[in-house]
Swiss-Prot record:
Span of the signal peptide: none
Gene3D superfamilies, alphabetized: ATP synthase delta/epsilon subunit, C-terminal domain, F0F1 ATP synthase delta/epsilon subunit, N-terminal
Domain of life: Bacteria
Protein name: ATP synthase epsilon chain
Name of the gene encoding the protein in the UniProt record: atpC
Entry-linked PANTHER family: ATP SYNTHASE DELTA/EPSILON CHAIN, ATP SYNTHASE EPSILON CHAIN, CHLOROPLASTIC
InterPro entries named in the record: ATP_F1_dsu/esu_C_sf (IPR036794), ATP_synth_F1_dsu/esu (IPR001469), ATP_synth_F1_dsu/esu_N (IPR020546), ATP_synth_F1_esu_C (IPR020547), ATPsynth_dsu/esu_N (IPR036771)
UniProt keyword terms in alphabetical order: ATP synthesis, Cell inner membrane, Cell membrane, CF(1), Hydrogen ion transport, Ion transport, Membrane, Transport
């Protein structure tokens, strides 16, 4: 028996990152983690900075960093419109570690809500990139 699947498109402002048949995806929505399986109810939600975990048609996994965006779920197709999307294999670990260090430094030295909020957002993005790098390595 063939696994149930649906079509997924992951698109950023720069290019189409993924287009193909998948078994499921996992992504961080505005209200928390979402697992999208075939037959999921229609949904439109914001995506928080993090990753999308894609389980392809034959079980192979792929991880893509998303800086945020929109997730649209329809009966036979799911579309991710990302602000920025970077494949796990294309992320620079040294750069992500440096971004994390700088964000932590800004948080510790912030003077006001705006500085703190911006530094917290940058820290979340850096941590998400590092997580995608880690999971991509494990999947290889």
């Amino acid at each position: 028996m063939a696994a149930m699947t649906y079509h997924l498109d992951v698109v950023s402002a720069e290019k189409k990152m993924f287009s193909g048949v998948v078994q499921k995806i996992q992504v961080t929505g505005s209200e928390g983690e979402l697992g999208i399986f075939p037959g999921h109810a229609p949904l439109l939600t914001a995506i928080k900075p993090g990753m999308i975990r894609i389980v392809k048609q034959f079980g192979e996994e792929e991880f893509i960093y998303l800086s945020g965006g929109i997730l649209e779920v329809q009966p036979s197709v799911v579309i991710v419109l990302a602000d920025t999307a970077i494949r796990g294999t294309d992320l620079d670990e040294a750069k992500a570690l440096e971004s994390k260090r700088k964000a932590e430094e800004h948080i510790n030295n912030s003077h006001g809500d705006v500085d703190y909020a911006q530094a917290s957002a940058e820290l979340a993005k850096a941590i998400a990139k590092l997580r995608v790098i880690e999971l991509t390595r494990k999947a290889m």
